[in-house]
A protein has these predicted regions:
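A structural boundary/capping signal
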Residues: 1-152
Length: 152
């Protein structure tokens, strides 16, 4: 089985390849990845880790001033972030240029004050209920299926 870092890096690279091929143009969801896409990226990566490796993860969000950010927290306490480099043009304490981070809470992530309890990513997040698939579930499903087409 691939390690978590390798899976996260491959997932990110795949999103970038699909974006380069304009797969997400006009989707209003992940077309600007990684900028402004930390939440959606976590939803999709969390699903991928669960389905492909049985790895449980929690959607973790925090704020610092007017900035917000989302990353995954794993059962062992490690965090996974594939969008941190969206802060590479920031200055001071918000500067961060790692495209993929897997490990213990680092200085950058610890600056964010959690604004809610982490929420586990489960199949219920992408399984339509008795009313059917809602608009956001549909967008995420299409993005996820597109990403999977690019994973070798």
């Amino acid at each position: 089985m691939k390690d978590i870092y390798q899976m996260a890096a491959e997932f990110r690279t795949t999103i970038l390849k699909a974006r380069t091929n304009r797969e997400f143009s006009g989707d209003g969801l992940i077309e600007r990845f990684p900028s402004g896409n930390c939440g959606v990226a976590c939803d999709l990566l969390g699903r991928y880790l669960l389905e492909q490796a049985g790895v449980r993860s929690w959607y973790t969000s925090g704020v610092i001033g007017s900035e917000s950010h989302v990353w995954l927290t794993l059962e062992n306490g490690d965090i996974v972030d594939i969008t941190g480099d969206q802060y590479k043009n920031q200055s001071g304490s918000l500067y961060y240029d790692l495209p993929v981070y897997v490990g213990r809470m680092d200085a950058f992530h610890s600056k964010f004050r959690l604004n809610s309890n982490p929420v586990e990513i489960t199949p219920n997040d992408w399984t339509p209920d008795f009313l059917g698939e809602d608009r956001m579930q549909r967008k995420k499903r299409i993005a996820y299926e597109t990403i999977l087409k690019y994973i070798g």
